[in-house]
Structure formats: structure tokens, C-alpha cells
Amino acid sequence: MAVKIKLKRLGKIRSPHYRIVVADSRTRRDGRAIEEIGKYHPTYNPSVMEVDAERVAYWLGVGAQPTEPVLAILKKTGDWQKFKGEPAPAPLLQPAEKAARPSFEAIGGEDEGKGEAITQKKKADKRDEAAAESSASEA
């Protein structure tokens, strides 16, 4: 049986998420997989590539062939170089640490409203007009 390591697409339209799977080469892209060995989320910045290196090494060792996109991912993570016995690539880009944001109270924010809402003023005006009309009709 010819085995391939390929991407299985998940997610909505224009929001792809992939699982790196080991499957028979004759199965459909999103068909049944033998084993899931990783994840790939290209829309995140930087993109997320999680690969189970031990299982990748096993499947490459028993003859599984990676597809071109999976081969590119394996080269970025360094698993392909480890399998071939070559030096590892430079480390991947890691997301930057976000600076601590000051709390709302520390900035001087107040928890008070700006005053009455516009709709309440309109209702008050209508009540005043109704009271003026009723007093005018009585007089």
C-alpha cells in the first residue's frame, strides 16, 4: 500500500485549517486517514505548524512519501533535515510577547455615564407638551 503524508483541509470558506495526516495515496483529500500527526494553520500570524516529530520520523522511515506542501512544512520544522541527516534550519518566527495593558482605572477612566440619553429627553419634551396642551384646553 502506497502511503502519503498529506494535508486534510478543515475550516470554513476562506478560513482554512489543515491537519497533517498519513493516508493511503488513493484516498480523497479529506478522506479517511490512517493517523493524524500534526496541524497547520496558515491564516494565523505567524502561521502555526505543530508536528509530532517522532511519528513523522516513523512514517518516513517505513516509506511514506510527503506531498509538496507537507514537505515544505517538514523542512521549516526541521523534521525533514533530521530524517535526511542534514543540519537543522534556522529557528521559526515566534509570536512577539504582548505588552501588559494598564487597567481601565489606572488610566483614569471613570465608571460614570455621560448623562441622560437622548431618547429620555424626547420623552420628557413630549410629556411637557402634553401637559401644556391639557392646561391650555382646561383654561
UniProtKB/Swiss-Prot annotation:
Q: Is Transmembrane helix one of the keywords UniProt gives this record?
A: no
Q: What is this protein called?
A: Small ribosomal subunit protein bS16
Q: Which family does it belong to?
A: Belongs to the bacterial ribosomal protein bS16 family.
Tell me, which GO biological process terms does this entry list?
A: translation
Q: Name one GO cellular component term.
A: cytoplasm
Q: Give the InterPro entries listed for this entry.
A: Ribosomal_bS16, Ribosomal_bS16_CS, Ribosomal_bS16_dom_sf
Record-linked PANTHER family: 30S RIBOSOMAL PROTEIN S16, SMALL RIBOSOMAL SUBUNIT PROTEIN BS16M
Q: Which cysteines are joined by disulfide bonds?
A: none
Keyword Metal-binding listed? The answer is no
Tell me which positions the record assigns to the signal sequence: none
Q: Which UniProt keywords apply?
A: Ribonucleoprotein, Ribosomal protein
Region annotated Disordered sits at 84-139
In the record, what terms sit under GO molecular function? structural constituent of ribosome
Q: Which residues form a coiled coil?
A: none
Q: Which organism is it from?
A: Streptomyces lividans
Alphabetical list of HAMAP family matching this protein: Ribosomal_bS16
